[in-house]
Amino acid sequence: MTDNLNLGAIDLGTDDEFIARHIGPRAADTQAMLQRLGYDSLDTLIGNVIPDSIKGSSVLDLPAGMGEAEALASLKAIAARNRALRSFIGQGYYNCHTPAPILRNLLENPAWYTAYTPYQPEISQGRLEALLNFQTLVSDLSGLPIANASMLDEATAAAEAMTFCKRLSKNRTSQAFFASRHCHPQTLDVLRTRAEPLGIEVVVGDESTIEDFSAYFGALLQYPTCDGEIVDYRELVSRFHAVDALVAVAADLLALTLLTPPGEFGADVAIGSAQRFGVPLGFGGPHAAYFATRDAFKRDMPGRLVGVSIDRHGKPAYRLAMQTREQHIRREKATSNICTAQVLLANIASMFAVYHGPQGLLRIARRTHRLTAILAAGLERLGVAVEQKHFFDTLSLATGARTAAIHAKARAAGINLREIDAGRLGLSLDETVRQTDVETLWGLLAEEGQALPDFAALAASSGDRLPVELLRQSAILSHPIFNRHHSETELMRYLRKLADKDLALDRTMIPLGSCTMKLNAASEMIPVTWAEFGNLHPFAPAEQSEGYRQLTDELEAMLCSATGYDAVSLQPNAGSQGEYAGLLAIRAYHQSRGDSQRDICLIPSSAHGTNPATASMVGMRVVVVACDARGNVDVEDLRNKASEHKERLAALMITYPSTHGVFEEAIREICAIVHDCGGQVYIDGANMNAMVGLCAPGKFGGDVSHLNLHKTFCIPHGGGGPGVGPIGVRAHLAPFLPGHARGERKEGAVSAAPYGSASILPITWMYIRMMGGEGLKRASEMAILNANYIAHRLEEHYPVLYAGGNGLVAHECILDLRPLKDSSGISVDDVAKRLMDFGFHAPTMSFPVAGTLMIEPTESESKAELDRFCDAMIRIREEIRAVERGELDKEDNPLKNAPHTAAELLGEWNHAYSREQAAYPLASLVEAKYWPPVGRVDNVYGDRNLTCSCPPIEAYSEE
């Protein structure tokens, strides 16, 4: 008889299984870190960090965590409630195929989706090249020389085009913008939202009936129209130009492979969506939009722009160009608050074009159009009135009294058609359509008993339905990069080559302050590519999206619990758009009370640049509030300015914990001062990762906050987007949350789709569900512990600029490098570049204080990784001391010359320090070394010699 092995007490549950996977430090590490800080427990540390005035404000009431497998099964059951019917709705959203090598090697690859915005170009060359490919794709197809690195969605891009035209039009007397009624309805809705606070009148009408062109400073046209017609806009554009108005054209990128591009018929701006280049429908997003314009207007273009420069060795290198245009620099003078792009989605579109090449894209476009032409010919034989003479992929049909019955019949057959009105319906085809789909559509639209057309006969007899005078004559995608990677092997290796050039979370900690580069767990990411979430059209009938409704309802409740607010909107598809929606809600609230004069927004001097930029966009005037020597809001200055502007005070925008990395003791008093003067308090949720489960902004004075789901709640940054920026509000602001034409409240849309970037919301649902209430609280506590551990280890080498009353920081700390500039000539930029030689992404540079580094380790980094970073920073300080002592030359030293490339080390070595010191300053680097692909990039050269499309092939051959 065999004795039973006694394993002792075993926990049979999996409630906290994921928490230990998400949080980096082990229990023993946590105790060691606490001991170093002089605390006996995590509770004691947190008790000394959180101000007494807000302790107990948390209302986090969530169930216990759930194991990974259990959470995935639970979410799968929710997803199963969605019914992804075959969609022919169109209206800017189309079925497409995501090529398998792009799905596996890019979209599902953490080397791509965990990277940050490429502000440090030397360690971002891979995704910068991919984005340059995207810009070249857009520039080629639009016929305009300058394209940016993507926008949030087509409707947002259209709104940016409107304000762009307002700034640049020489028609200074007009406040009216013409928008064709043939534009997508969701675009028109966002235009109206964005125009009203700026005093712009959006006139929606038929462009063929315009009598006084001088009444408008600009216009937006759709090409082809939403209903499918291909219109010759050449004369119309000329008439607008004759009165100094600018013209923006919303154009379908796939159609532009066959049609004359907007730039060739005079458009000043082209905007649109790249969704159909390999990105799933996703119930509306995320998708990459595009924005292209003339060279003369490049400095006024919104969004990010990738350009070509050189490194210090004269080698071509990519970088973000003309960054002085961006809102974080221009602040209240900014003309846009866009501070991100849809990089991951733009890179998918970029690689879709690289993989298919010009001939592949033309095949897709021609096949899509031919099938549409055959469909139209068959419908006409069946007696159905096709309203378009010329079209690309979309038809509108006059179906009269039969319309409702046809829709019902289609849905019973698993098909969605576009609902235009009671007597008309629409059909949009795409790259996934085949002969059987066309025959099925004939069957749905035929009268009972009618014989269906013969497909083969119609295919042979029907011609194209593109207007001859608008056929494209110019070549597309002639650059070699679009003509060499057409086999899966070649594309796979190209993607690997690019990924190897970059630093992302799959290689190293990214300690960027105010960015919260935490773990994006694999189990959170898996549902993103489920067909149940990816294949649903955002305008499908409501009964087909019950799974999404359950997901969003549950997620809104979770976020209310985390923040203490009463209502949440998930529509904003970036933090900047959440800010905008929050200030719009405040503005609308004041107007509803007859307080339209309230237009003053108080903003601390330490605020992120989006805050003043957003305030300006909603028509508010910014008044800056001073900060004291410890980095806190100067309460007396706030009191004086709130009192001075009492009758006009609309809002205070404040980040909490502060952008200086401190929990300000006076936050309740600050909120009360503003409320007493009739204002509302907007608490920027960028730093929510320090608060979840510990304190709740909705309970200590906030009226509204936006949350960065791509920070606190684990949606990956994707190399610079996507993001989600939902807003939470107190009950009195709930009626003023963003609306949508397909929702109960019709006005106030800030995104094209009702739920913005809906298909990545499962990431946050999974994170919250697996962590549970206790896990979320522990994440906040560990983020604070990790930040204080780094601050404590480094404070004897670099001054920690700000701390709270107990000498502790929140979830991030700021190191002051300004004294080093005076003593050694070493700048913050030199330290940032030197960190690359150690295999690290630099912390946030010179924000919120010039000459500093802001470090945010997050809860996901282990003690070993924190120590590795601290060891690197300490070794760098030793190198600076060597410069101070004269042991290293002030100009020829490892910091001034950083980063060092492999090619440099293999070449002739003329430096006063060794190759080993340059490349292997720590012994640990011998085991695993990251090599920056280029040396330090010359920013000035890049802006003076601006090139924003793919460089000639010779540049690639030099690699």
UniProtKB/Swiss-Prot annotation:
InterPro entries: GcvP, GDC-P_C, GDC-P_N, GDC_P, PyrdxlP-dep_Trfase, PyrdxlP-dep_Trfase_major, PyrdxlP-dep_Trfase_small. SUPFAM superfamilies: PLP-dependent transferases. It comes from the Bacteria. It holds the Pfam family GcvP2_C. The modification N6-(pyridoxal phosphate)lysine is found at K711. Its cofactor is pyridoxal 5'-phosphate. CDD domains: GDC-P. GO terms for biological process: glycine decarboxylation via glycine cleavage system. Its EC number is 1.4.4.2. Keywords: Oxidoreductase, Pyridoxal phosphate. GO terms for cellular component: cytosol; glycine cleavage complex. One of its GO terms (molecular function) is glycine binding. Coiled coil: none annotated. It catalyses: N(6)-[(R)-lipoyl]-L-lysyl-[glycine-cleavage complex H protein] + glycine + H(+) = N(6)-[(R)-S(8)-aminomethyldihydrolipoyl]-L-lysyl-[glycine-cleavage complex H protein] + CO2. The glycine cleavage system catalyzes the degradation of glycine. The P protein binds the alpha-amino group of glycine through its pyridoxal phosphate cofactor; CO(2) is released and the remaining methylamine moiety is then transferred to the lipoamide cofactor of the H protein. The glycine cleavage system is composed of four proteins: P, T, L and H. Belongs to the GcvP family. This is Glycine dehydrogenase (decarboxylating) 1. The lineage of its organism: Bacteria, Pseudomonadati, Pseudomonadota, Gammaproteobacteria, Pseudomonadales. The gene is gcvP1.
